[in-house]
């Protein structure tokens, strides 16, 4: 049975694209057939991870300009032979790259990618569509999922959505079975996550979708630590009651909580379980170029986190 998973966030900068791309690549490496869709049409970035500038995008399919087989690119061989962006002479990197034996032992998976057309014409066509065209595009969203299942026999459909509560991100969520609401442990993310859950996520879960909180870029892993104290980095809440109407967890400042307690409390408050909390790894976060960590550095702790995520799914 195909699983359709959408990575979403209330605001940008949560790392959802990194998580979506690495999850898709890891599943393909494990032998699954994976379709990866860039539906963040306002700020597409798959081209940075996969080093390709698409001519045709998935938004061209939604605009009825091409069929789905023209919008999906078979990227399996390119991923298998992905070259390191870090120079081979850089011996300071602490994690081993893929060995030849590891490459041979992998099962044969498939990875198709639906890039988003970066040209402004494609974005304007979607953004300025009239009501009748938007209804047709909604049908195309559903048709897209059906075609990826029937024609590509996908085991997984991974969607990177636009952040926020835009028309296109909501429709991306509507075709997904599993919704991963990605957030950081800051007041902007938590407040926005509360809005997203109350405004749209409860409607989806009411009709059978499964939603999870996915924490990313959690402080505390990188050494040396920041000048902020532990209590300053971790959100605080009042320990005995649920926040009242109009108040958020981060407005309550009576008792500091560690990450585990905070995650449990927010999940209880929103009625959505947390699936994973991923630390911030500075070597990835501050790299000058994007790359697929799970393929290049299978022993990296971030790769182990993605292993845990796909296993949980």
Stretches with model-predicted labels:
Residues 41-149, 286-292:
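P-loop/Walker-type NTP enzyme "switch/lid" segment
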Residues 2-42:
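Walker A/P-loop phosphate-binding motif and the immediately C-terminal alpha-helix
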Residues 29, 138-275:
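Conserved catalytic-core segment of NTP-binding enzymes
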Residues 1-4, 224-233, 310-313:
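Acidic-aromatic/histidine active-site loop/patch
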Residues 2-6, 35, 111-113, 155-158:
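Residue-level preference for the first positions of well-ordered beta-strands
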Residues 21, 299-313:
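Short, amphipathic alpha-helical "lid/cap" segments that border enzyme active or binding sites
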